[in-house]
A protein has these predicted regions:
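N-terminal signal peptide c-region/cleavage motif recognized by signal peptidases
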Residues: 17-19
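Outer membrane beta-barrel
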Residues: 24-48, 56-181, 188-190, 194-205, ...
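Outer-membrane beta-barrel proteins
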Residues: 48-52, 94-97, 131-134, 181-186, ...
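Extracellular loop and loop/strand-boundary signature of outer-membrane beta-barrel proteins
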Residues: 54-57, 97, 146-148, 179-182, ...
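Short sequence motifs at beta-strands and strand-loop junctions characteristic
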Residues: 61-64, 101-103, 152-154, 186-188, ...
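Flexible, surface-exposed loop regions and adjacent strand-edge segments
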Residues: 101-103, 139-142, 257-267, 320-323, ...
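Detector for outer-membrane/organellar transmembrane beta-barrel domains
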Residues: 193-324, 329, 341-342
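Outer-membrane beta-barrel "beta-signal"
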Residues: 331, 370-386
């Protein structure tokens, strides 16, 4: 079965590639339907140090835009209605491996219909919070972002979504994942989302939130949530960003070769795991504060900086703070080169680590290098989009 699916995808890619010679894009249009092959390759060389004394040089994947291959399409049904689909697979550029070996399309696989009154989608799809990364800070909430090291719930299975048009500056979005939903049943683990964004001239403010319920009667009977408030101002030559997050979606994670990292786990998960009701990390609540700004020194060159704090408001022991600086150069419309520097300082009880659009292929994994340590990183990389 997997072989037949792979052959079908290959045939579709070849067909679209053939059409691209005539059209200048990786798209094919027939009878009002358009199918596009898209993706990117993002790789970077990193130099990372820990205040423990450890150092590491590595080729990593996905600082800014995780490597991926996708297919998307739409068909005009008339009267302002369109049928749509997206199928997207994450890849690791450093090894050629799938981001998730258990799924063919781990990032997205959904179908829907766009109407004059909004868009309806069904399937595995990105969260409302995930889509708003570019509203959060100059990195697009990727490598260098303090908000990003906390972990962002990114996508869920069996998700039903509605996205409104923008009316009077407002855009609303709601999701309900029935992946674990069993109404009136003790194992109901539904995941719900809501978002509201307002845009007026150079100003934007908004909220995006997600919550997952544990099974009834769980040992840790806490709803796990992630609430993100944001605002930004386009001052003409760049933007200023403010972000605040309130969440209990953090926990410990196993270290290597042994021991435990004080942070890095997520009771709600970041790519589709449901709340089991057994993770005591859900008992600890955090506030995250971050300020960021960027500036275009040239039409194709942007520089930026940020500073953020993670505050453990329950026990005051898992605090961290960090900063990031970076520069992005759009060499062509398809190629971007970037350089980044960032620092993350953990309190003795904290164990946060840097993370990009993709998790680091080669992170520090020993508790001695992470817990209570200051981790610094320099990165230089490139994104090629097609």
């Amino acid at each position: 079965m997997k072989r037949r699916i792979a052959l079908a995808i290959g045939a579709l890619a070849l067909t679209a590639a053939g059409a691209s010679h005539a059209q200048g894009t990786l798209s094919m249009t027939k009878d009002g339907a358009t199918v596009t092959v898209y993706g990117d390759i993002d790789y970077y060389l990193s130099y990372m140090t820990s205040s423990s004394g450890s150092k590491q040089i590595a080729l990593q994947d996905g600082a800014y835009l995780r490597t991926r291959l996708g297919f998307k399409g739409d068909k005009d049904l008339g009267n302002g209605y369109f049928a749509k689909f997206t199928a997207e697979q994450g890849l690791n550029e450093t090894s050629g491996a799938q981001a998730d070996a258990t799924r063919l399309f781990d990032r997205q696989l959904w179908a829907g219909i766009a109407t004059p009154g909004g868009e309806f989608r069904f399937g595995r799809q990105n969260t409302a919070i995930f889509y708003r990364g570019s509203y959060i800070d100059f990195t697009g909430r990727t490598l260098g972002s303090v908000v990003n090291v906390f972990g962002t719930p990114s996508r869920y299975d069996s998700d039903i979504a509605y996205i409104s048009p923008r009316w009077a500056g407002f855009l609303a979005e709601v999701h309900y994942s029935i992946q674990g939903s069993q109404p009136q049943h003790s194992t109901n683990q539904a995941v719900s989302q809501g978002a509201l964004d307002w845009e007026y001239g150079p100003f934007r403010v908004g909220y995006a939130g997600i919550a997952g319920r544990p099974p009834a009667g769980s040992v840790v009977d806490k709803t796990v949530f992630y609430n993100n408030f944001y605002g930004n101002w386009d001052y003409g030559k760049g933007k200023v960003y403010l972000a605040f997050v309130r969440s209990n979606n953090q926990s410990t994670t196993p270290g290597t070769p042994s021991g435990t990292l004080n942070n890095g786990g997520n009771p709600l998960g970041t790519t589709g795991a449901l709340v089991t009701g057994t993770d005591t990390g859900a008992n600890t609540y955090y506030n995250i504060y971050q300020v960021s700004a960027d500036y275009y020194v040239a039409p194709t060159v942007r520089v930026g900086a940020l500073y953020g704090q993670i505050k453990d408001t329950t026990n005051d022991v898992k605090n961290a703070n960090g900063w990031g600086i970076g520069a992005y150069w759009d060499v062509t419309k398809d190629v971007m080169v970037y350089g980044l520097g960032n620092s993350l300082s953990n309190d003795p009880g904290a164990g946060f680590r840097p993370s990009g659009s993709a998790g680091l292929s080669k992170p520090f994994t020993s508790p001695a290098d992470v817990n209570g340590q200051r981790i610094r990183m320099g990165a230089f990389g490139m994104v090629y989009k097609f």
